[in-house]
């Protein structure tokens, strides 16, 4: 249950992502290896595919480590789904740390040490020491039908909530959790 990285059928993606000893990570792969990344990455190249909230989290993490960062976004602007305060803060951070911003650029192929991307000026290689594919999250609710079957004969209400229903932002999950607690309190299940 919950959500997992969205990994579309892009040439080389599944061959390279989150492989032991590899250099290409999903956000979950990054989190699982967060302590393995050096504190000082000066002179190292980081390439991030995806200019949404998750990709920008990766940028923020590595900018503090003095890496040379490039972020690739297929849309015309980076951080389109962010609230205005966060978007402005990220723009300032990217400017301060000299992050290369490549908009209207799409991932074509994933290689061991580079991404092949295509923008308005054609296709080119984007080399990296560490590459990150942050194209969003997708719901993983495969256990929900099993839970419905398991409790079909009981007087138990089963709800599919959170990212297993639909992947979304943390603020949405927080609001949903608050609403569930409110309704449980109203029904007398919580004091």
Regions found by a protein language model. Name each.
Residues 115-119:
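SH3/SH3-like beta-barrel fold
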Residues 58-72, 151-153, 171-191:
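Internal hydrophobic alpha-helix adjacent to the cofactor/substrate pocket in enzyme cavities
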Residues 4-10, 103-114:
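A conserved short coil-to-beta-strand element within the FAD-binding core of flavoproteins
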Residues 3-65, 154-169:
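Glycine-rich dinucleotide-binding loop and its adjacent helix/turn
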Residues 59-105, 165, 191:
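Rossmann-like dinucleotide-binding cores of NAD(P)H-dependent redox enzymes
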Residues 42, 121-130:
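Core beta-strand elements of the Rossmann-like FAD/NAD(P) dinucleotide-binding domain
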């Amino acid at each position: 249950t919950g959500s997992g990285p969205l990994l579309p059928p892009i040439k080389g993606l599944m061959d390279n992502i989150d492989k032991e000893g590899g250099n290409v990570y999903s956000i979950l792969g990054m989190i699982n290896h967060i302590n393995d990344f050096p504190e000082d990455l000066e002179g190292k190249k980081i390439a991030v595919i995806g200019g949404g909230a998750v990709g920008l989290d990766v940028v923020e993490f590595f900018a503090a480590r003095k890496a040379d960062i490039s972020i690739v976004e297929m849309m015309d602007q980076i951080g389109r789904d962010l609230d205005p305060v966060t978007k402005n803060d990220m723009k300032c951070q990217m400017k301060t740390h000299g992050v290369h911003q490549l908009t209207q650029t799409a991932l074509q192929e994933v290689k061991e040490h580079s991404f092949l991307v295509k923008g308005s000026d054609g296709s080119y290689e984007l080399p990296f020491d560490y590459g990150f594919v942050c194209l969003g999250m997708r719901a993983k609710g495969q256990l929900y039908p099993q839970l419905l079957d398991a409790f079909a004969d009981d007087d138990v209400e089963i709800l599919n909530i959170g990212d297993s229903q639909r992947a979304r932002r943390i603020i949405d999950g927080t609001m949903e959790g608050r609403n569930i607690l409110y309704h449980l309190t109203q029904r007398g299940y919580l004091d």
